[in-house]
């Protein structure tokens, strides 16, 4: 039970809207960093005045790399109770019918980038046995956490339909800025309310006693249950790398080509053999004719082109710092050596990344388990105490691909003394109970058709065969 506040739904709407508005600027900034829309950093104003719109910042996608490298190793494969040999097929059915296989990936990315995301559960009028599961962005949703038990006390989702025309007076406390109709969904322990332009339009009195929202929080702390972004620690280095890469392109524009000068000549003297004036780019590339002055003493000189190695070395050093902070293998950031790495060295380099993924499975799995407990509550009409121990089944993050997973499972089974039986191997490969049952039927059929098995069966069925052989 959460600590109740004596607030009306309208009061909750205003309270959560204000709290959400405070965080929105930072959440949008983090989202822009992931989408490679970051602002220019460490750039001198004189460069902007000199180059103007010709300067396009070079953006290195390290922010996406840091997030995606972890998320690619987070794959839920089912839910089960500790005393069950296999996963709960019905919960997995609800998960898949809500397209949670695809949408949960989006929720994990948002949580890693913007500190948290949310999973919402609701009643399904079309099919009461399949409650609705949706994944929501922190840009649209906010939850109030009870400081006593750290459970969700209320949650609010706000969004705007820019294509619709407002038919009711607007409510500035809901969403600031933008045109169109402003909608909101308010989640309370015993009811869900829908608002349009600040006026309640409908409600669902589900009487569950718990807010039907499970926060997916990344890197929460004891005093900060709203989480932190995976990008917080690497953004200064990413900005520095973007600045160095941009400086390198500016240097390539102005000083990467040799600069040639001529003494005793004016710009009008640059002509080709036909008497045509040379363009600036032709002169810069050296395709010009040197014309001496009246006394024939025209002289040419040349400045050597700039060496860009210092930019390369700086970017490589920043890449090493990002790899060490984010726990990424060096080859993820393009850092290689002359000697190709061995398979063992690659696995060793990925150990910290694997451990980071395993750490993420604990809080993210807890949110998914709470989601499925809410699903079970809507299905049965009451709480099942057994589901307090529900577990999320995750794919092994050290074998993120199907090929790696199959190789590991088959090796465990093909040992001289197998560590796991055949059924467990098939479960590790991700086959469902129905698929495993069909495989076992085919195994039995194949064994019955085996010639040696048929001969053995005939001998064992022949009357007195053993006694005759003994005689």
Regions found by a protein language model. Give the residues of each.
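C-terminal amphipathic alpha-helical
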Residues: 102-115, 119-120, 250-253, 307-403
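Extended, charged amphipathic alpha-helical segments
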Residues: 5, 201-348, 390, 401
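Long, compositionally biased
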Residues: 259-260, 267, 350-369, 375, ...
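Charge-rich, acidic-biased intrinsically disordered regions
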Residues: 16-17, 24, 124, 128-129, ...
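Extended, regular secondary-structure scaffolds
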Residues: 118-230
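Extended, helix-rich architectural segments
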Residues: 1-135, 146-150, 457, 465-471
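Short, amphipathic alpha-helical "recognition" segments used to contact nucleic acids or chromatin
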Residues: 406-416
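Long, highly charged low-complexity segments enriched in Glu/Asp and Lys/Arg with interspersed Ser/Thr
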Residues: 424, 429-460
